[in-house]
């Protein structure tokens, strides 16, 4: 194979099994080819079930696997602080607009249609609770505690 000069994993590394991803990159990159990765990685675990720990690769495991598969880390850049304003704005938007609209809708439906509201609440309450728990994912302080948004440039070593 060895057809490509560059493979770009832009916010997709977390969906690829670590070793399998590096094996495929080895197969498809030309000698001296590059693997450019931009994604968030877990660097701290505290034994909790925080949602930040679920959908990211462990940073050290990822870097160790890269080395083990013959990739040299050429450059790395911690992009975390540059991405936090997006999370902060998302949280602001939900707190300022979405939550008040939902609260008013719930209040109004309970006041005007109590029986219907009770049935609907019973049906969707667990799903809403699950989604509310995911709001920790846009808490920039929680993100900083567990993850780093990293950009890595690897080069396939000539073997």
How does the language model describe each region?
Residues 154-157:
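Active-site beta-strand termini and strand-to-loop segments that position acidic
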Residues 145-152:
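Short hydrophobic/aromatic beta-strand or adjacent loop that forms the aromatic wall/cage
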Residues 32-40, 44:
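Conserved beta-strand signature within the Rossmann-like core of class I S-adenosyl-L-methionine
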Residues 19-34:
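A short glycine-rich, Lys/Arg-flanked "PGG" loop and its adjoining helix->strand segment in the class I
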Residues 15-16, 44:
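Catalytic P-loop NTPase motifs of RecA-like helicase/translocase cores
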Residues 1-7:
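A short acidic, Gly/Pro-enriched loop at the edge of an enzyme's catalytic core
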Residues 49-141:
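Substrate-binding/catalytic lobe of Class I Rossmann-like enzymes that use SAM or dcSAM, i.e.
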Residues 10-13, 38:
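Residues lining the SAM
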């Amino acid at each position: 194979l060895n057809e490509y000069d560059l493979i770009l994993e832009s916010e997709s590394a977390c969906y690829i099994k670590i070793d399998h991803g590096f094996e495929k990159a080895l197969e498809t990159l030309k000698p001296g080819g590059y693997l450019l990765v931009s994604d968030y990685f877990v660097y701290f675990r505290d034994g909790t079930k925080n949602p930040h720990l679920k959908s990211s690769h462990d940073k050290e495991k990822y870097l160790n696997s890269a080395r083990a598969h013959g990739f040299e880390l050429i450059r790395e850049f911690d992009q975390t602080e540059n991405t936090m304003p997006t999370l902060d704005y998302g949280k602001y938007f939900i707190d300022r607009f979405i939550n008040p609209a939902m609260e008013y809708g719930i209040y109004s439906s309970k006041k005007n249609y109590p029986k219907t509201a009770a049935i609907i609440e019973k049906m969707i309450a667990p799903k809403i609770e699950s989604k509310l728990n995911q709001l920790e994912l846009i808490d920039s302080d929680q993100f900083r505690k567990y993850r780093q948004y990293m950009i890595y440039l690897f080069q396939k070593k000539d073997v």
